[in-house]
Amino acid sequence: MRCFLDTSAFVVLYHKNDTYHETAKKIWLKLKEQDAVLYTTRDVVVETVILVRRRDGFQTALICGNDLWESSLLELVQPSSQLDRKAWDWFKKYADKELSFVDCVSFAVMNDLRIQTAFTFDKNFKQVGFESLEP
């Protein structure tokens, strides 16, 4: 199985008081047990570290950042300028949705790598046609 990991999943995994923390842990363990091939982007990592720092402080953000940048479980995609342009097309196409540009980069990467499934708690992935994992 190939799966894209979104900011929302990482933030929930590192924020132990989040309503979905236990659900996220179950999904994460299931992905590891299945030896899933996991992808994310530099944009997602940057956004995650920013949000974790705001919610849980510098030390947790430092641990999170180290985990993500150094993970042997993640394929860290560095989007090209061509993929950034495709992301911009996603952004324009879905003007009626409240998409972040980071989400659009994720969609462009998923589309380019033919990944249909995301580990996310963000409804926007389903709104544009991708699937999200359930526990």
Where are these regions (language model features)?
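Active-site neighborhoods of divalent-metal-dependent phosphate/nucleic-acid chemistry enzymes
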Residues: 75-117
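A general alpha-helix detector
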Residues: 9-10, 47-48, 86
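Conserved beta-strand edge residues that scaffold enzyme active sites
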Residues: 45, 82-83, 124
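Short, well-structured N-terminal submotif of metal-dependent ribonuclease cores
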Residues: 1-40, 53-67, 134
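Short secondary-structure boundary segments
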Residues: 42-43, 103, 122-123
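Acidic, PIN/NYN-like endoribonuclease modules and their adjacent C-terminal/linker elements
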Residues: 107-135
